[in-house]
């Protein structure tokens, strides 16, 4: 893949319910990896997530993830994609931070 992929995530509010997020155009996501002490709950824009899932190969394609709420930004891979089996809508994304971040 010649073009680079990027997505922006925001911290997920502690009281936010997944279905309410989806109704408001957001997808729950999580960021974890060897350089991150504990997993970080995020939300990403549904349309941006759909484009990312369409273009990225899970566990292979490097993606630039930025989180304006945190001083963290770096390269991740799309570790897991969860989708509704009948509706074919995204439910959850898991991002794995690469070790060099």
From Swiss-Prot:
Q: Which Gene3D superfamilies match?
A: Ribosomal Protein L25, Chain P
Q: Which GO terms describe its molecular function?
A: 5S rRNA binding; structural constituent of ribosome
> One biological process GO term for this chain?
translation
List, alphabetically, the InterPro entries matched. Answer: Rbsml_bL25/Gln-tRNA_synth_N (IPR020056), Ribosomal_bL25/Gln-tRNA_synth (IPR011035), Ribosomal_bL25_short (IPR020055), Ribosomal_L25_dom (IPR029751)
* Gene Ontology cellular component terms for the protein in this record: ribonucleoprotein complex; ribosome
> Which domain of life, per UniProt?
Bacteria
Q: Does the keyword Lipid metabolism apply?
A: no
Which key words are in the record? Ribonucleoprotein, Ribosomal protein, RNA-binding, rRNA-binding
**Any Pfam family matching the protein:** Ribosomal_L25p
- Which family does the entry's similarity section mention? Belongs to the bacterial ribosomal protein bL25 family.
The protein's job, in short, is: This is one of the proteins that binds to the 5S RNA in the ribosome where it forms part of the central protuberance.
Q: How does it assemble?
A: Part of the 50S ribosomal subunit; part of the 5S rRNA/L5/L18/L25 subcomplex. Contacts the 5S rRNA. Binds to the 5S rRNA independently of L5 and L18.
Q: What is this protein called?
A: Large ribosomal subunit protein bL25
Print the organism lineage.
Answer: Bacteria, Bacillati, Cyanobacteriota, Cyanophyceae, Acaryochloridales
């Amino acid at each position: 893949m010649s073009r680079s992929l990027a997505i922006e995530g925001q911290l997920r509010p502690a009281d936010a319910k997944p279905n309410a997020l989806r109704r408001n155009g957001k997808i729950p996501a999580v960021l974890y990896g060897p350089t991150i002490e504990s997993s970080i709950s995020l939300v990403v824009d549904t349309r941006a997530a759909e484009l990312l899932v369409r273009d990225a190969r899970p566990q292979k394609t490097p993606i630039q993830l930025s989180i304006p709420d945190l001083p963290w930004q770096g390269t991740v891979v799309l570790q897991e994609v969860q989708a509704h089996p009948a509706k074919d809508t995204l439910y959850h994304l898991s991002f794995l931070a690469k070790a060099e971040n």
